Amino acid sequence: MSRRLMLTQIRPSKPTSDIDRYEKKNIYSTFRPCAKHRLGNAVSYDLPRLVAQKGVENVYDAIGALPGITVQNGVYMLGGRTIAVAINGKTQNVAYDQLQELLRAMPASGIERVEIIHNPAARMQANAPLIALTFKRGDAESAPFTAEVGGDMSLRHRTLFGERVSGTYRKGPFSLDLSYMHTHGRVLDALRTDIPEVLSPSGGPITNTQERLAATSKHSYRLAATYTLGERHTLTATYQGFNTNNDLSVSNTDSHFGSAAGKVKAWLHNARIDYSMPFGVRLGVEAAFYRAPERHVLLDYVSPFSLYPDYNPWLPTLSRQDFLVTDSLRTDLWRAYIAGEHELNNGWTINYGAWFKKVKHNSVHHQRRHVLGYNVEWNYPEEHFTTAYVGVSKRFGEKLSAEMSVSADYYHRIIITQWRVLPTFSISYTPCDGNVLSLVVSGSRGYPHYSDMNGIPQPDNGGYLYTLRTMSLMPSLHYQAQLSYATKGGFQFRAWYNRASGHVMQQLYPDGFLRCVILSNKNVDRHQQVGLQAVMPHQFGSWLYTCLTLGGAWTRDKYEPTLWEVPVNSRIIHGEAKFTGVATLCSKPNIALSVDAFGQTKTQQGVWELPAHAQLDMSLRWMFCKDMATLRLFCNDVLANGTPKYRYMVYDKGFDLRNVPRRHVGVSLTMRLGGTR
């Protein structure tokens, strides 16, 4: 069964002529990121150069190459918080796992500029650090048509293939962008679980290795059309989505053994229309429809020799528990917004707006067990989000600027109704050309993922491990303060303090009646973090680029449990380091070697300990045919040690969960077409 483990909107302001001149003056021939002074505490990066040298194919992997970005539980994090993404000024509102699929279908070569806003203002309509992507639009001198085709093959104990195509057409006021990706093959994952006797429902230790083989076929696509009416009227229509089909085969070994077969499908349709008017008003509507039906048949044979140590070995019998599980999940999203921004006299700017979102879920869960019979559960909650905001910004000469905004957030679910007022204040000072000192204080909301609260338990590990969903999860409230300094050469130094109430984390407790261990998502009473980070890029001539990111944080989690649950009052200091290096081995032919390394000391998430781990990725890139073709060889997780282990300590015994690490090797080829008139 699928299982989620500890899961834990920007309008592009038109730059002034001074900033335009400043940007042109600071376009380096290297990959060195340049900090540029922008309202909203944004730092702009010349990412396309680094993407070209590393040979990165898609937008999702390009975001991972940004300084300061780390990965936690398969999710991109920035300053200890999950990121949000905006594409051409439009924040993406689909869930993170759905957004991940869409970004993988978009070509990285289309990126023109990337901005990072660590604490976005209310006008940016984001509750997390924002990665604002701007894609190339072309001009009168550009070619009317460009295209890119590519394919890749990767091996991680099974072979996975991918084909992709993207194209851009521009003529006069009209532009059209298309991207499509098809992925197919087999994926093998292995999950190892060690349950000590103090937590075991049988009184003895349980060790289980679960191998999951998926035959997958996935289609991802995006179509965006923009038409400029008159001088400054702009109409944009975007359609994006994916369709995936997985046939699963699962086997359990060690303490108990058995098998499972399943079929998992999912498809997403997301459409939006945005309209910009010349006097600073924008409005838009959006709809998304997501479907994810599943069907699993589990045949589980329990070995008595390890589950019941005192059982007479001369009477070997096997107890059988088989069950059929079907689940049908539907999610419908509707969203509408209106926003305005106007420049006033003496450097003042005012912005205002409001948006409304309605999300309707529907899930029906059928379960038929060999012993307990037939069971049906269903959930059909609705979520309503409403936000209204107003803000002002002011430039005090060429060196100082400030921005302040206030938003009123309303959230409603069948058992919850909440109002919150969230302020944001930022001030930036430029002591000299290219250096920026910023202070930001902000408040934001976090909302639990629907899969964490759909009220339907999901069995795993042969039925001895259950992930229990709960509808009682509440939205979390976050307050952040950050002080940062960015230099002209791209160095960044950052200190932050985060405080959250209601942060969602996963807890566990044994259930003797159900004879299983239950994993349940809970709202942590208090989550605090104080962190430091330094980003230090450097260019050595024209042949070597390096970027070293060092960070550390003090984190505290506190949770007062109810009956049978585990209390949490953890404090820990941990550090992490990330290194990126790109060496040009030869200019003719154009060959470059890329090395990415990441290391982290022991840390903790709620009741779970994460021992220290490290990961090393390497790739070799060759550009030929006048740099219109790129061949890339890569090996991810070279040391086979990049997958963290999640451990819960009971006295001197550990309950361990770990995906078995495997090296990931492959080759990709990309061809660019067009680009010349």
Predicted regions and their residues:
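Short, acidic, small-residue-rich periplasmic hinge/interaction motif at the N-terminus
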Residues: 2-51, 71-73, 80-82
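Short acidic/polar hinge/loop motifs at secondary-structure boundaries
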Residues: 92-118
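Gram-negative outer-membrane beta-barrel transporters
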Residues: 523-603
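C-terminal beta-signal and adjacent terminal beta-strands/loops
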Residues: 622-677
